[in-house]
Amino acid sequence: MTLTLNHCPAPAKLNLFLHVTGRRADGYHLLQSVFQLIDRGDVLHFATRDDNLIQRTTDLPGVPAESDLVVRAAKLLQTVATEKNPAKNFGADIAVEKKLPMGGGLGGGSSDAATTLLALNHLWQTGLSRAELMALGLQLGADVPFFIFGQNAFAEGIGEALVEVETPDRWFVVIEPGVSVPTPQIFSSTELTRDTKPVKISDFSGAQESFGKNDLQVVAEKLFPPIAEAIQWLGQYGDARMTGSGACVFCPFEQEQQADAVLTTVPPHWKAWKAKAIKHHPLAYLQQS
């Protein structure tokens, strides 16, 4: 029997700040950041299959199915499900509605993978806990556990050590500068600051507005001038900064009307949109404790 779960949100995130505090022996960078969920993202649709096949039914230019984090997440969970119940087949058709830009620093691919793990854990009745799903997610990428964690979080380590943090209700204007940033290019730069002094959660909670910076931003601005142009333009309205390794930039506003007013003035060569801060992942209800 085919079971379906349609219109599953895969929300984007913004890095309210992002500090690089060191580097591990294996080359991974040590980070501190606050991840903020927003109400804009991709949308996924799932239907179970009885033949053990995992199929992405959507054509995504430049993203082969076999390397797509969505397919990799499904196959990873399929392996665990099969080990738990060898007599049963675990297959799925997955459709992906991409609304977020690739290489934008919004966590789109990671969020898609997390939504896949949450949805198929439910449909396949795999019974994995949130912690177990987060551990699987870490095998796919450092940002995936956050989206399974499902709450705004202070992140450390390579981004996988998460503590829930309160953030204010507000709106964001986000600009897509029209470039796609390869994350490895930013982290491999000799100009990247890798020794920012670590901060505490209380430092962020006590300041919130305009706290910290994005250490990756200086490198990205030099490599991709449209990012610098977007930050300079948006900065006339508030504390504009880049999210993740770019390319998207954002600025917070207390009122929706303020965000709407700024949107009407964005130069036409940029794509821009508004988003609302949210406190929990929309699929949090699917999680096992």
Curated annotation (Swiss-Prot):
Entry-linked InterPro entries: GHMP_kinase_C_dom, GHMP_kinase_C_sf, GHMP_kinase_N_dom, IspE, Ribosomal_Su5_D2-typ_SF, Ribsml_uS5_D2-typ_fold_subgr
Annotated catalysed reactions: 4-CDP-2-C-methyl-D-erythritol + ATP = 4-CDP-2-C-methyl-D-erythritol 2-phosphate + ADP + H(+)
Active site per UniProt: K13, D143
GO molecular function terms listed in the Swiss-Prot or TrEMBL record: 4-(cytidine 5'-diphospho)-2-C-methyl-D-erythritol kinase activity; ATP binding
Residues that, per the record, bind ATP: P101, M102, G103, G104, G105, L106, G107, G108, G109, S110, S111
Top EC class, one word: transferase
Keywords of the record: ATP-binding, Isoprene biosynthesis, Kinase, Nucleotide-binding, Transferase
Any one Gene Ontology BP term: terpenoid biosynthetic process
Pathway where this protein functions: Isoprenoid biosynthesis; isopentenyl diphosphate biosynthesis via DXP pathway; isopentenyl diphosphate from 1-deoxy-D-xylulose 5-phosphate: step 3/6
EC number(s) stated in the UniProt entry for this protein: 2.7.1.148
UniProt entry tagged with the keyword ATP-binding: yes
Domain of life: Bacteria
Family: Belongs to the GHMP kinase family. IspE subfamily.
Physiological role: Catalyzes the phosphorylation of the position 2 hydroxy group of 4-diphosphocytidyl-2C-methyl-D-erythritol.
Name assigned to this protein: 4-diphosphocytidyl-2-C-methyl-D-erythritol kinase
Organism: Janthinobacterium sp. (strain Marseille) (Minibacterium massiliensis)
Organism phylogeny: Bacteria, Pseudomonadati, Pseudomonadota, Betaproteobacteria, Burkholderiales
